[in-house]
Amino acid sequence: MTIQQKVPTVGFVSLGCPKASSDAERILTKLRAEGYEISPSYDNSDLVIVNTCGFIDAAVEESLDAIGEALNENGKVIVTGCLGAKGDIVQTTHPAVLAVTGPHAADEVMGIVHTHLPKPHDPYSDLVPPQGVRLTPDHFAYLKISEGCNHSCTFCIIPSLRGPLVSRPVGDVLAEAENLARAGVKEILVISQDTSAYGVDLKYRTAFWGGKPVKSRLKELCEALASLGIWVRLHYVYPYPSVDDVIPLMAEGKILPYLDVPFQHASPKILKAMKRPASAENTLERIAKWREICPEIVIRSTFITGFPGETEEDFDQLIQFLEDAKLDRVGAFAYSPVDGAKANELGELLPEDVREDRRRWLMQVQEDISADKLAAKIDTVIQVLVDEVDEEGTIARSKADAPEIDGLVYLDGHFDAQPGDFLQVKVIDADHHDLYAQVV
């Protein structure tokens, strides 16, 4: 005999113009698609959503009255719609509401509903798990915040494949992140083609999440993600000045002190040919500033060797930059022509063996730098996230290591741990890529 679970029921009040009605229909459709019941009665509802209007004074008064009635009759009220975008008028008048959003915020409203009235997951009837269908292990997930790119790097054809920058609404991004955290994900890896440009196309528009305004900009997005209480790691960060704004968040422990910035080269001539920003001198100054603000910061980057026109002098400048910057993690690629890329028009391609030899030499230089940096961690205690547990042992990662591209922490001994567990470990050895540690 099976015990039938009570279906969560949502009361709904919609005021205002046809555009408000359209927003209401989107919310109602999502509620029904997820299995929530809709009720015209306050009494039979587990909570009530009031879709408001704020166009004229009479509409504001009507909306505030409707919110008050819902609070009196039910007690659990979510407010959405135009009135929610007019400052703090709702919270000031009715501080007991659960949350407030602006208009066209269906996904944000659903996230709030999930928080206050989660629908029990039924593996027999629900086609999709709460966190969505994922290809990654259960304890970490990639969170794409935008699509496309506005740059015209000569070695890249991404803009022609994926189009210009299109940022996801911040409420949608945060709702997905919240679902992931609720499903047990311990680490979110923020990705896009150009993470630091997030929100540029939206003109940094303010949206609502959890009843609070959030600007569609990287700093504010990171602050909101930090409230989830899990690891947040930034990837594919273009070296804009705005990146400086997130470094204090790393210093405060709100997001991981990890920055993946693809510098690509250090020679001014080659950077110009690539149509990449900055110069080696300016970049070194910024790295020094980042480390001054957040001494624990880990900087990962990628470089291209053998780009068309790269001379021995250009390559020497790149090697000198590596030795000066002392980056923590580096990946390198020998230049390979891409059909449709403008770099194909820059001149004769360097011989393949030259391109590959330079890549190998760069990585050898970086191995020595990495070995010194990792050796400095011996005898320190660090936090790690367990990735794998089998009969051969336990493999984890530190805050300095992204999955698949960085190093690992191999744990000595046998103990009770599962993937997704956080552990405190003491580093006992290191090589140029990985750490070896014991649980403390």
From Swiss-Prot:
GO terms for molecular function: 4 iron, 4 sulfur cluster binding; aspartic acid methylthiotransferase activity; metal ion binding; protein methylthiotransferase activity. Residues 8-118 form the MTTase N-terminal domain. It catalyses: L-aspartate(89)-[ribosomal protein uS12]-hydrogen + (sulfur carrier)-SH + AH2 + 2 S-adenosyl-L-methionine = 3-methylsulfanyl-L-aspartate(89)-[ribosomal protein uS12]-hydrogen + (sulfur carrier)-H + 5'-deoxyadenosine + L-methionine + A + S-adenosyl-L-homocysteine + 2 H(+). Binds 2 [4Fe-4S] clusters. One cluster is coordinated with 3 cysteines and an exchangeable S-adenosyl-L-methionine. [4Fe-4S] cluster 2 binds at C149, C153, C156. The keyword S-adenosyl-L-methionine applies. It is found in: Cytoplasm. Keywords: 4Fe-4S, Cytoplasm, Iron, Iron-sulfur, Metal-binding, S-adenosyl-L-methionine, Transferase. GO terms for cellular component: cytosol. InterPro entries: Elp3/MiaA/NifB-like_rSAM, Methylthiotransferase, Methylthiotransferase_CS, Methylthiotransferase_N, Methylthiotransferase_N_sf, NA-bd_OB-fold, Ribosomal_uS12_MeSTrfase_RimO, rSAM. Its cofactor is [4Fe-4S] cluster. Its main location: cytoplasm. Pfam families: Radical_SAM, TRAM_2, UPF0004. PANTHER family: RIBOSOMAL PROTEIN S12 METHYLTHIOTRANSFERASE RIMO, RIBOSOMAL PROTEIN US12 METHYLTHIOTRANSFERASE RIMO. NCBIfam families: 30S ribosomal protein S12 methylthiotransferase RimO (TIGR01125), MiaB/RimO family radical SAM methylthiotransferase (TIGR00089). HAMAP family: MTTase_RimO. Belongs to the methylthiotransferase family. RimO subfamily. This is Ribosomal protein uS12 methylthiotransferase RimO. The lineage of its organism: Bacteria, Pseudomonadati, Pseudomonadota, Betaproteobacteria, Rhodocyclales.
